[in-house]
């Protein structure tokens, strides 16, 4: 089962429903509505979905931003349905996002992953990411 990757330009009910099923496997955040997903895309985010046999089984968001040191890219909210893991979905999604970031001129792609996501961290290292000696801080506002 080889996954196919698509960039979502206009969120359909199918995409919103799939995200409502997938996102709880990653986070306790409330899944976005169609209009919120449209705002992410309109704001410069690129939303990818992965399909196996026509069904959406994974997604990620690629965000690009320009700062004085260049165009940077972040991969966020990578999630693969538990039932589809081990089929190359995460790898295909990440490689598609990296290709898109490169095509758009980014000079680096960053992502974060919790330590306990052992398989995900192994994947990121296998496809060329390296851990940075950095600490990520967060402040809720």
Task: Tell me what each language-model feature is.
Residues 1-13:
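Conserved N-terminal entry element of GNAT/NAT acetyltransferase domains
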Residues 27-47:
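Active-site rim helix/loop that mediates acceptor-substrate recognition in acyltransferases
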Residues 49, 55-64, 74, 79:
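Conserved beta-strand in the GNAT
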Residues 51-53, 139-140:
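Active-site beta-strand termini and strand-to-loop segments that position acidic
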Residues 65-75, 85, 132:
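A conserved beta-turn-beta hairpin within the catalytic core of GNAT-like acetyltransferases
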Residues 80, 86-99, 122, 126:
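Conserved acetyl-CoA-binding loop-helix of GNAT-fold acetyltransferases
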Residues 91, 115-133, 139:
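Conserved active-site alpha-helix within GNAT-family acetyltransferase domains
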Residues 101-113:
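Conserved GNAT acetyl-CoA-binding A-motif
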């Amino acid at each position: 089962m080889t996954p196919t990757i698509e960039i979502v330009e206009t969120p359909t009910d199918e995409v919103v429903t799939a995200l409502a099923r997938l996102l709880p496997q990653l986070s306790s955040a409330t899944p976005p509505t169609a209009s919120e997903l449209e705002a992410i895309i309109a704001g410069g985010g690129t939303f990818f979905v992965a399909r196996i046999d026509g069904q959406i089984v994974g997604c990620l968001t690629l965000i690009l931003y320009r700062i004085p040191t260049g165009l940077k890219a972040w991969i966020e909210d990578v999630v693969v349905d538990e039932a589809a893991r081990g089929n190359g979905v995460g790898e295909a999604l990440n490689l598609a996002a990296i290709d898109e970031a490169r095509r758009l001129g980014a000079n680096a792609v960053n992502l974060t992953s919790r330590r306990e996501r052992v398989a995900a961290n192994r994947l990121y290292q296998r496809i060329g990411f390296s851990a940075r000696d950095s600490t990520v801080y967060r402040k809720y506002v």
